[in-house]
């Protein structure tokens, strides 16, 4: 007699009963927490002698939560079926308190201000990031399924620091790793249909802005931040087309400004600026025309560390566009003397001939045989034409950036770079 089916069915029914029980208990607990929060809010307002207004007007708020996600939020999200897969007990849809992580909360009129028990302590925030990197990301090295989850939860970490105005060394260390997470994501997820790279770049710039403010505070207090040069370099390269980035660098203390990684970042910044202006007044060919070519060589050089290269990769389409335009201006096209496509691919760090063809086609520049038709003209006018939409990266670059990536993402996020690039002596 086969008893497998009845046994399996009984186990399924038990699981359903447990889930119904948990839901009932969860709703009861949630209602208790709602009532407790109302009392707690009134108590805090009374203690602060604030009869009208907000808690933020009463006093600086200090978080007391030692869980990665406050209990109230966890119970509320459970009732709304808003628990993410990395937060669930395996094989269930129930929130695991040891895995659930507080979400980012947008500021909006009508939203309640957080209570102290809604805000995590600095140690808890650091432990939360440890969990995100060493557990969640470690289980998904390609970041495909976990990226959106981690991006939201790291925003929440930064938000808790900001609300409490915590600006200590823990904040610095946490923000540094969050910045590295965004840089790694820009490379690994490039071309993924569900990845909006501009959103990660926005969050990276926000994080770097916070770090620069924190570094300034620590420097005024004569506290040394060991990774300051590394993250100033990232700030410079994340603002390649912004002249203000150079002015920020020029105001740095000498030992930071002269650090090899900062100098390498400034070199990339200078080359990207120079690459944007086509030069029509020389006949010396592409080598003297456009520093965009040198930009890719600099990214590939051993002196450019991994994450700096990942960040520079974000600008590859615009640098290539400028280089292509400059070469079209410099070369008078002659049929049968097209520019070798393999040389073109190497020069602008393309991974394949197909990638070259796809890129050039966006600008109305064609290929003939094994060559690129640089400088082709119709009725005396160059055929180069900018597309309606700016070209985007379609896959991670392997030729120069991928060649540097010899470690799992979690190590790139956690580890400092090679000390010879960060030296400030």
What kind of region is each of these model predictions?
Residues 1-168, 178, 184-187:
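N-terminal alpha-helical interaction modules that lie
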Residues 135-142, 163-164, 191-197, 305-310, ...:
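Short interface patches used for recognition in eukaryotic signaling and trafficking proteins
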Residues 140, 184-193, 219, 241-244:
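Short coil/turn linking the two alpha-helices of tandem helical-hairpin repeats
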Residues 170-173:
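Structured, charged N-terminal subsegments at the starts of enzyme catalytic cores
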Residues 177, 186, 193-200:
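Non-catalytic protein-protein interaction scaffold segments in large eukaryotic complex-forming proteins
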Residues 177-179, 184-186, 234-241:
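Conserved small-residue packing positions in alpha-helical repeats and bundles
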Residues 197-359, 363-369:
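Alpha-helical scaffold segments of alpha-solenoid architecture
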Residues 376-425:
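Acidic, serine/threonine-rich low-complexity intrinsically disordered linkers/hinges in large eukaryotic
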């Amino acid at each position: 007699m086969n008893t497998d089916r009845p046994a399996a069915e009984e186990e399924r029914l038990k699981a359903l009963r447990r889930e119904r029980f948990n839901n009932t208990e969860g709703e009861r607990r949630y209602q208790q927490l709602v009532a407790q929060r109302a009392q707690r809010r009134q108590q805090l307002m009374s203690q602060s002698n604030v009869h009208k207004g907000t808690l933020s007007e009463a006093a600086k708020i200090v978080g007391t939560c030692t869980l990665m996600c406050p209990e109230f939020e966890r119970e509320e999200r459970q009732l709304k079926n808003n628990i993410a897969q990395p937060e669930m007990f395996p094989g269930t849809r129930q929130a695991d308190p040891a895995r659930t992580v507080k979400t980012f909360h947008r500021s909006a009129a009508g939203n309640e201000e957080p209570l102290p028990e809604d805000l995590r302590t600095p140690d808890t925030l650091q432990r939360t990031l440890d969990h995100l990197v060493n557990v969640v990301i470690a289980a998904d090295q390609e970041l495909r399924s976990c990226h959106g989850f981690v991006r939201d939860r790291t925003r929440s970490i930064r938000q808790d620091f900001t609300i409490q105005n915590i600006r200590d060394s823990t904040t610095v260390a946490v923000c540094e790793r969050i910045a590295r997470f965004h840089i790694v994501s820009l490379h690994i997820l490039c071309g993924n249909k569900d990845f909006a790279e501009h959103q990660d770049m926005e969050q990276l710039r926000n994080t770097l802005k916070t770090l620069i403010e924190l570094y300034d505070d620590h420097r005024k207090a004569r506290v040394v931040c060991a990774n300051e040069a590394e993250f100033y370099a990232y700030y410079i390269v994340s603002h390649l087309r912004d002249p203000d980035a150079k002015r920020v660098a020029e105001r740095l203390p000498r030992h930071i400004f002269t650090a090899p990684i900062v100098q390498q970042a400034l070199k990339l910044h200078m080359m990207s600026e120079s690459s944007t202006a086509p030069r029509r007044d020389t006949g010396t060919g592409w080598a003297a025309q456009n520093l965009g070519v040198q930009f890719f060589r600099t990214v590939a050089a051993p002196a450019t560390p991994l994450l700096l290269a990942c960040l520079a990769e974000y600008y590859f389409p615009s640098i290539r566009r400028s280089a292509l335009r400059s070469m079209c201006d410099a070369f008078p096209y002659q049929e049968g003397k097209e520019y070798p496509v393999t040389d073109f691919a190497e020069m602008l760090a393309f991974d394949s001939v197909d990638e070259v063809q796809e890129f050039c086609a966006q600008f109305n520049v064609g290929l003939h045989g094994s060559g690129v038709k640089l400088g082709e003209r119709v009725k005396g006018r160059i055929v180069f034409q900018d597309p309606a939409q700016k070209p985007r990266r379609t896959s991670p670059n392997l030729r120069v950036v991928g060649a540097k990536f010899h470690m799992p993402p979690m190590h790139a996020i956690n580890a400092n770079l090679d000390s010879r690039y960060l030296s400030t002596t």
